[in-house]
Every structure is written in structure tokens, then in C-alpha cells.
Amino acid sequence: MDKTLKLLILCLAWTCSFSALRCAARTYPPVATNQDQVIKFTTEGATSQSYKQFIEALRQRLTGGLIHDIPVLPDPTTVEERNRYITVELSNSERESIEVGIDVTNAYVVAYRAGSQSYFLRDAPASASTYLFPGTQRYSLRFDGSYGDLERWAHQTREEISLGLQALTHAISFLRSGASNDEEKARTLIVIIQMASEAARYRYISNRVGVSIRTGTAFQPDPAMLSLENNWDNLSGGVQQSVQDTFPNNVILSSINRQPVVVDSLSHPTVAVLALMLFVCNPPNANQSPLLIRSIVEESKICSSRYEPTVRIGGRDGMCVDVYDDGYHNGNRIIAWKCKDRLEENQLWTLKSDKTIRSNGKCLTTEGYAPGNYVMIYDCTSAVAEATYWEIWDNGTIINPKSALVLSAESSSMGGTLTVQTNEYLMRQGWRTGNNTSPFVTSISGYSDLCMQAQGSNVWLADCDNNKKEQQWALYTDGSIRSVQNTNNCLTSKDHKQGSPIVLMACSNGWASQRWLFKNDGSIYNLHDDMVMDVKRSDPSLKEIILHPYHGKPNQIWLTLF
């Protein structure tokens, strides 16, 4: 009897262990192989929704983990060659189809199959021809996959090549035909790369394609789209190598009007258009996503921690953290002051690896650990060490770990002394690092591709029109969203409860209901209330945007349109 019981217990333990291992394995999605189910998209009867589902499936297959809550491709050093490629089947209304091979380590198109023949870009990895399209007759194309080479062979730039369903339908038919026209091959591959790979990388680009499908109109890439395509590696590197919310190098994008957009911080609103990053390195001591298996994380490249950026710190009403009157004597107060036209010492702060924040070699220091204590400049060696330590969170909060209090600009007046306060995610407690502290001006697209529009103190959705001032919004360093018609008015939830309408109210109080975070899931998130902006009942005719718990449906998805 005892032996039987022991045997039963042993079997149960083995079963539970195996089950636990199996369940744990499910936590980590396997890297896709070209033998897995092919992702498909057809232009026949295509809708913006079917295209969205295709892009979401492609993103999911390409995702290897999360860094700073943003999906990232697998680290190339952890991917076996046999698992390096996935295939996408594209078909058109004439029932012609091709398969496209994509490298999971960079989301590049490396080859395509047309019937019994396959064609590999000149710079395709050597292993691509081994693992992609077995049993086909293989050919090497005369050009590589870079836009520079593709444009040379196409005798057209990306700006000159139309995108949309008609262009994709033609691309499928032409490549399926096996015609030997290299110029047209290059042109059609530019179409496919942008409508698949680039759309998987950026929400902005997938949105442009989706609008094109919904309206039945072709489009050419605008300057904003091209600048995103040209800076994917830079944006990915900026996010992953960021120190205390700050990029190691500015990333210069372009607006649709060809105005420079300087992205220098994780909390910059444009980072939210990234849907999928190139893997560059793992941030040191970062909390890794559960998608990343521990052994893989340990083998992955770790970002350098030696970088110590010197930057401005922008906050309430776009003012800068400033050493009062350029005085560096111990105990001199720190104030909020208009950011100067030139970079000057008393508004420049070095974010040190020891968690101190220094100006002219002296430390930003809290006078004490009670709410309301003022913040001062102090000699780093003689100050109480814990009073000089700060963490800058991805959401723009600057916190003193010892006290758990946050940096706050309680006064709306220029020259107001900065203090530490209980963290309530107030607008006056929001900050953004970087030397470009100007508001980012953009339109904001939402449900049914309509744009957010100010109408007096009300806010609703209307047909997008770049020329309408009512649809232009200034996104400030404090997390506020302001109508460019009157930047003293902020988007504000009337109350802290579900269903509260979003309206325009005076920014002067710096409330929590006026601080917003653009997230990579497409939501505009209120940190204090843990809710997001929501088009009421998914019905723009109600002319009401409300506060609502996040569920991820289309009426909660927003996008800055540069």
C-alpha cells in the first residue's frame, strides 16, 4: 500500500512538473520558422480591417520580446539560422499569389517566390537560400534590398511611387509573371516592402495604408513617413540605449510639412508610433519582458551604461529646471524658468550613472524627505547622498527613491521654487529630458480616421484637415495636450471617474486630469486615473470623448500625424 501511494505521488509530481514546464514554455512564443503557418493577405475584397489583422499577425510573428514596453525583434545572436525566416503569402483579385521571405532579425524582405521559381535580393543572408522556398529554382536579383539601390534600379524615388491596393495588386501580378524587367521588379518590391515590413514597424505607416484602403485612394509617402523609414534603427537604438529617459543622440524626423521633429527622450510623444523595434541591445538592469527567456537575455548584448547625457529638463508649461540666478552656492534654490534661446549652464543637467543629476558639477538635492521640502543645488560630496539620488521614469516622473517623493513645480509662475511632493501624477509633476523643449505640434487621428478637433471648450472628432487650426495640438513637456489656438487651455477630464467627458480647461492648476501619456498600444493614457481617452460608444456623432478603462478597441486608438 505504501509503495503504491509513493508511486502515485511520484507520478503526480512528475506530471505536475512536466505540466509546469509545458505551461512555462507557452509563456515564451517560439521563434517563427518558415515551416510555420504562412501569414496571408489578399487584395481581393480587402478592407482596412483585414489589412490591420494582417499587419498585427505579422508583428506578432516578428516580436521577440519587449523593451520599455515596446515590442522588439529577436536578438540576432539568439536566433538559429533555420528559425531566421518567415513567409508571407500575398494574393490579388486575379487569384495570383506570391510568397515573400522576411528575416525575423530585421524585418527585411530578402526574397520572394513566384510559382516554382524564387528570387533572392543580392544582399540576402547566405542561409536564406537554404531555408526559404525549398524545391524551387533559385535566382539572384541584380540589386540589394536597400532603398538606395532599389530606387536606382527603379529610376524613381519612394516619393514618386504610389502605394495602395492597386499598387499592391499590380506588384503581385508582375512578380508572379516572372517577367525579367529589373526596373519594374525594383519598383514593385519598394511597394511590398513599405506596405508590409515598414507598416509592421510603424503604426503611422500602417495607418496611412489603412486609410488608403478605406478610401480607395492611392498615396505617395510623405516626408514624415520617409523620415521614419530612414530612422528605424536610430529610434530603436535611442529607446534601448536611453539613460534616465534620455536618448544618447537626437533623432531628427520630419513633419509632413518638412519641419524638423527632434526626438530625444523616451517620453517624447512620437516614440508611440513605433510598433516594432530593431534589436540593438538590452538596457542594463532593465526589467525584462516575460517574453524573453532568461538564458537568452543573459547571452544578449547589454547596452553601455557609461553614457551620461547633459540636457535640459523641461516641465510645467514648457519651463526648464533652472539654478536660480546662476548661483551655485550650497542651498540655492532650483526654480522653473523660461527655457533660454541658447543652452546655458544653469539650465543644463548631467544625468550621472550614480543616479545624481548635476549642473556645473553640483547636485540637484532635496532639502528633506517631507512633502513641500524645497529642491536646491548642493555640493555632491558634502550633501546627504540619498538626498541627491533621482530616478527618471519612462512616463516623465522624476522621483527621489529615499522619500518616494517626486519633483514638482507647484507654482505656475515663472521663478517658482521646485519642491518634492507626494506622487499624484499631476501635470505639474511631469517632465521631459532633452535639449529641445519646444512643444511638439501635431494633429491627432482617432476612431474612423477622424481627427481630434477643438470647438470652444469642447473636443470631438471631425474629418481631418491639415489646414484647420482647430485640429492642431501642442504636446508639452509636462504631458499636457493644448490647443494651438490657445495654449493656456489643456485637454482635461472633468472628473476622475469612468465616463467623464474630456474638455478644454485652463492649464493653470496643473491637475492630474491634464497629464497624458501617448502609449505604443495607441492609447492616450491618464496616469492618475489609470484610464484612457475613448470615443463615447464608438459614435463620433455624439461629439464626446470620455475617460474610460482601457480595452484596446478602435475607439481608444489614437495616432500623432506629425
Curated annotation (Swiss-Prot):
Q: Which UniProt keywords are present, listed alphabetically?
A: Disulfide bond, Glycoprotein, Hydrolase, Lectin, Plant defense, Protein synthesis inhibitor, Pyrrolidone carboxylic acid, Repeat, Signal, Toxin
Comment on protein domains: The B chain is composed of two domains, each domain consists of 3 homologous subdomains (alpha, beta, gamma).
Q: Where are the 2-gamma repeats?
A: 529-562
Q: Which domain of life is it from?
A: Eukaryota
Q: Where are the 1-gamma repeats?
A: 403-435
The record's 2-alpha repeats, renumbered to this chain, cover: 448-483
Record-listed Pyrrolidone carboxylic acid modification sites? Q35
Q: Which family does it belong to?
A: In the N-terminal section; belongs to the ribosome-inactivating protein family. Type 2 RIP subfamily.
Which InterPro entries does the UniProt entry name for this protein? Ribosome-inact_prot_sf (IPR036041), Ribosome_inactivat_1/2 (IPR017989), Ribosome_inactivat_prot (IPR001574), Ribosome_inactivat_prot_CS (IPR017988), Ribosome_inactivat_prot_sub1 (IPR016138), Ribosome_inactivat_prot_sub2 (IPR016139), Ricin_B-like_lectins (IPR035992), Ricin_B_lectin (IPR000772)
User: By its UniProt entry, which PANTHER family does this protein fall under?
Assistant: PTHR33453, RIBOSOME-INACTIVATING PROTEIN
Can you name this protein?
Abrin-c
> To which species is this protein native?
Abrus precatorius
Residue ranges of 1-alpha repeats? 317-359
| UniProt xrefs under PROSITE patterns | RICIN_B_LECTIN, SHIGA_RICIN
Query: Which residues does UniProt mark as catalytic?
Result: E198
* MF terms in GO: carbohydrate binding; rRNA N-glycosylase activity; toxin activity
Q: Does the keyword Signal apply?
A: yes
Could you tell me the EC number(s) of this protein? 3.2.2.22
Q: Which residues form the signal peptide?
A: 1-34
